[in-house]
Amino acid sequence: TIPMVAQQPDARDILDRAADAFRREGGVKITFSVRAPEGNTNGSIRLKGDKFLLETEGVTTWFDGRTQWSYLASSDEVNVSEPTPEELQSINPYSWLSLYKQDYKLKVAKTGNASDDTAYKVVMNATKRSQDMQCIILYIEKGSFRPLKLSMVQRGSKDAAVVFINSYQTGKNYDDSLFVFDRKAYPTAELVDLR
């Protein structure tokens, strides 16, 4: 008899399954910690399709799929823009859901520790020097295909920003209005239209 060996899925298959799992889960709320060269921060992101509400220390960002509003508490100012997919990469840690299908070379790597049994390590290297994110490393839980951690290196930088997923709640029923800036909630804020 021939011993059966479990086939290791390839990087694209892992990311396809992770993206599919994310889309099936409806509204998602994630809390996270970021360790970056410019400092550490904590935050949360609520996602529904391509919409998100990102809250970090001092900054709240709404994105309705087209328009983005970023509120800076320190200046009581809201910047309004229509970001390109490239600009969204540096704002939304979940932009990899659409990025991996183009302009990135994918591979599965060993995690180098005991988590090899519980997580896939997928390395995404940009194929174009113009890509804002030159390298993204995703640790994806086997079974659920949920991201556990991601590491990102931007163009022109040697240092990675590492995002640790602290909690991942699914099945949230978010109204589309959650992803749009509510002027009434910030009556004194100055709007700066960058469109």
Where is each model-derived feature located?
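Envelope-exposed proteins and targeting segments
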Residues: 26-28, 41, 50, 57-59, ...
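An N-terminal domain-cap segment
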Residues: 32-45
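Short, charged low-complexity intrinsically disordered segments located at boundaries
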Residues: 43-53, 97-99, 168-170, 194-195
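Flexible, processing/modification-adjacent segments and terminal tails
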Residues: 7-27, 33-36, 64-134, 193-195
